[in-house]
């Protein structure tokens, strides 16, 4: 059986500083200083009972396990010197940023539709400064983490995300969060089009909709847009690069 060549870009003189992550469809080589974990929309809205997703009728039963796996991922990433970046989705309290009837977002956002169906919720869902908009308690950003607010599914649309990454020489993005098939996939696709190497940790994401939706995104990422790995493999791999005390 022939050896499998790892994907990913590394200059020859930098290979000794890199680690190789087991992934599908092939392993990928990552340099921790050129890698970021991107935490997508881990807000009360998407993962907590009483949040927008719950109120809109989606099943959030799997969110608790997703939170635990993301926490494990972030602990390992920070210990290895990997940058952590949070996306936080939402709009101003008057929903000007959400767009009016002339915007597709007005018609497709389930948060906006839920508030139109239930006027008593107006101003409570995904509005900046509300409980719904806040990052969940278990995954609060730590010193050194970066927070990128966004107003649409992709974290690259009308944000400074690309500039944040290029200023730090980051080429590899490891995606975790909710929802696999919406904001995670949208952001990973845009990362691909901007020449970033995208990895999705399949057991640190959660979908909205039937279970086959999760597998559809896994297939899309693995076959067309990036690489798919697991939390345990990521943690074991980056621990090889964790700084040691003198």
From Swiss-Prot:
Annotated source species:
Rhizobium rhizogenes (strain K84 / ATCC BAA-868) (Agrobacterium radiobacter)
Q: Which HAMAP family match?
A: RutB
Q: Name one Pfam family in it.
A: Isochorismatase
Please name the taxonomic classification of the source.
Answer: Bacteria, Pseudomonadati, Pseudomonadota, Alphaproteobacteria, Hyphomicrobiales
Root EC class: hydrolase
Question: Per the UniProt entry, what are the Gene Ontology biological process annotations, in alphabetical order?
Answer: nitrogen utilization; uracil catabolic process
Q: Where is this region: Disordered?
A: 1-27
List GO molecular-function terms, semicolon-separated.
hydrolase activity, acting on carbon-nitrogen (but not peptide) bonds, in linear amides
Keywords of the record, alphabetical order, are: Hydrolase
Q: Which family does it belong to?
A: Belongs to the isochorismatase family. RutB subfamily.
The active-site annotation reads 41 (proton acceptor), 150, 183 (nucleophile)
What function does the entry list? Hydrolyzes ureidoacrylate to form aminoacrylate and carbamate. The carbamate hydrolyzes spontaneously, thereby releasing one of the nitrogen atoms of the pyrimidine ring as ammonia and one of its carbon atoms as CO2.
UniProt catalytic activity: (Z)-3-ureidoacrylate + H2O + H(+) = (Z)-3-aminoacrylate + NH4(+) + CO2; (Z)-3-ureidoacrylate + H2O = (Z)-3-aminoacrylate + carbamate + H(+); (Z)-2-methylureidoacrylate + H2O + H(+) = (Z)-2-methylaminoacrylate + NH4(+) + CO2
What does the record list as coiled-coil region(s)?
Answer: none
| Entry-linked InterPro entries | Isochorismatase-like_dom (IPR000868), Isochorismatase-like_hydrls (IPR050272), Isochorismatase-like_sf (IPR036380), RutB (IPR019916)
Signal peptide boundaries = none
Instruction: Give the Enzyme Commission number.
Output: 3.5.1.110
Q: Which domain of life is it from?
A: Bacteria
What's the gene? rutB
Recorded protein name is Ureidoacrylate amidohydrolase RutB
């Amino acid at each position: 059986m022939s050896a499998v060549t790892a994907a990913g870009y590394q200059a020859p003189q930098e290979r000794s500083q890199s680690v190789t992550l087991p992934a599908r469809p092939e392993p990928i080589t990552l340099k921790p200083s050129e890698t970021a974990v991107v935490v997508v929309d881990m807000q009360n809205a998407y993962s907590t009972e009483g949040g927008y997703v719950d109120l809109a009728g989606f099943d959030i039963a799997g969110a608790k396990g997703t939170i635990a796996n993301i926490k494990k991922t972030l602990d390992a990433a920070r210990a290895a010197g990997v940058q952590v970046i949070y996306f936080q989705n939402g709009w101003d309290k008057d929903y000007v940023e959400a767009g009016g009837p002339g915007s597709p977002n007005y018609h497709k956002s389930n948060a906006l539709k839920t508030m139109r169906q239930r006027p008593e919720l107006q101003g409570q869902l995904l509005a900046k400064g509300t409980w719904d908009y806040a990052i969940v308690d278990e995954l609060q950003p730590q010193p050194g983490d970066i927070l990128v607010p966004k107003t649409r599914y992709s974290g690259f649309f009308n944000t400074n995300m690309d500039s944040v990454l290029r200023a730090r020489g980051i080429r590899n993005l490891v995606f975790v969060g909710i929802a696999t098939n919406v904001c995670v996939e949208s952001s990973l696709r845009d990362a691909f089009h901007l020449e970033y190497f995208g990895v999705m940790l399949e057991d640190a994401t959660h979908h909205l909709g039937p279970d086959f939706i999760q597998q559809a995104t896994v297939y899309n990422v693995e076959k067309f847009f990036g690489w798919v790995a697991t939390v345990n493999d990521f943690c074991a791999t980056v621990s090889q690069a964790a700084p040691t005390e003198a």
